[in-house]
Amino acid sequence: VTASVQGTVSVTGEGYTTIRDSTCGAGNFLNLAYAKLREIETDLLADQRRRTGSQDLSLDVSLDQRIHIDRFYGIEINWWPAKIAETAMFLVDHQANRQLAAALGQAPVRLPIKITATIYQHDALTLDWSQALPKPAGRTFVFGNPPFLGDHTRTAAQLALMQAAWGEGKQLSRLDFVTSWHALTLRLLAERDGEWAFVTTNSIVQGDQPARLFAPIFAAGWRIKFAHRTFAWDSQAPGKAAVHCVIIGFTRDPGTKARLFKYEHARGEAREVPGVKTINAYLVDGPNVLVDKRSTPLAPDLPEVTYGSKPADAGNLVVTAEQYQAVMADPVMAPYVRPYVGAVELIRGQQRWCLWLADMDPDAPSHSPELKRRLEGVAAERAKSKAASTRDWARFPHLFRQRGLVSDVPFVGIPEVSSEARAYLPVAHFEPDVIISNKVYGALDPDGIVFAVASSSMFITWMKTVGGRMKSDLSFSSTITWNGFPLPALTDKDRAALARAAEKVLEARALHPRRSLAQHYAPLGMDPALVKAHDGLDAVMDKIMGAPRRCRTELERQELLFARYAQLTS
């Protein structure tokens, strides 16, 4: 350990390295980095004195130091935190000098103050980093926790800053604001030796962001040196909620051992994953495969899935449990009432209905005051929308604003969001009269293959690995998780085996017909018969994917999935 640390201090000092927090706030990261490096340096100098006496040390201990405060830089947009960061760095330096004096009997004299950390009070995205941070003879280390703003929360001004950071040709759709710091760091370190790491929201390693973000990073010769998978971080700032974060560090050194840390749950302790060789963009030990959005399924045997229908109605086309009896008592509205199922209804077994008026008699509103009131409410809601396309639909208040899958045969429903705690994705069968909302995806499934695939451990592993998240919950998408699922071509034997295994799952559920899917798949309360049925399904699915037997771990499945994806997309 001492040799390793000695090497670190030597590189830091003799090569004249700079260390920079590109979003330093009040300086916490800089303070910790400087304090820890000074602590290590003091331990090494004290150890050197114990082993050799004072003969190898200078009379002025500052001549033996390699960690200097003036090689630390920070950028903070607000004046007050920037001043706090400056002061805090001086105090940390003072404390480190006291520790050095206690260990060696002397410390550098800092008064009057001649050197200190450089803290720029500036917007990091408009500051010229190469000018603000002079190129050293040694290495440059960049780190920080840039602002957490998603695709849907950034302003037009922030979008312009992102475009400037990435360049005019970069497609920014879905990219988080935080990725602007990745772009500027790539530019800064293009002609410098160094490494970098950021704390970011976990969304950058989910869904369609990894392909857009990591492609230019990997193309520039960078690889992931270390990473912490998703964990919850409670901000200490007033009014700030907990966010789900990842930490990713990058290096261009191919010989550096990759280190990956995981958390059993978002607020748990970090545990290092043993035997890691390569960390890919999804923070998995595996090849650097990037899963792109697709408009059609990669797998030849999978049909397309379609999300359901969205009313944009201020609740006027939806019938709640409390309203149901009154609506059904209206002879005009009753024929148009159909079950309306969103993700909550699908998973928890709750009931809700809608007025499906696609074939409505044009005279119907004149014969039902309640129907007329509801349709007028829909028209008024749409007329005041900011979206011109929605305002246009005020002319058709009896129709859902977005019409998704509506089937005249039974079909399968998959919730858009499901708890990460469940071992399996809760998939449902629906009769043709059911209208699914835009929070459910549907697909025709005449032979049970869709149900079998979506209900397997292989698929939920894929979803956990490359899919998006809502906080820590799993988010299903047609373009990434479904269309990108690397299911090889099925033989007739495969299809028959999957259909039989899917039927066993349904039979196990039928043993407890009153249970909701949430109850069937309660993480700590699954029925043994249902677990056994899913084990049987997994044995079939895992073998189809290339495993010699049912996989025992998520890692085994991830390795198969990425290998199959690389094979099918090569």
Q: Predicted regions: what is each one?
A:
Residues 72-75:
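Conserved SAM-binding motif I beta-strand of class I
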Residues 1-67, 77, 81, 123, ...:
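Class I S-adenosyl-L-methionine
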Residues 31, 38, 82, 90, ...:
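Signature of N6-adenine DNA methyltransferases within the class I
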Residues 24, 370-378, 394, 487-570:
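Non-catalytic DNA-recognition/assembly elements of restriction-modification systems
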Residues 85:
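Conserved SAM-binding loop
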Residues 179, 256, 264-500, 504, ...:
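Polybasic, glycine- and aromatic-enriched phosphate-binding surface used to engage nucleic acids
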Residues 62-68, 115-118, 240:
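Extended charged low-complexity segments that act as oligomerization/scaffolding linkers
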Residues 1-18, 59, 107, 111-141, ...:
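Flexible, glycine/threonine-enriched loop-and-boundary segments that flank and lead into catalytic domains
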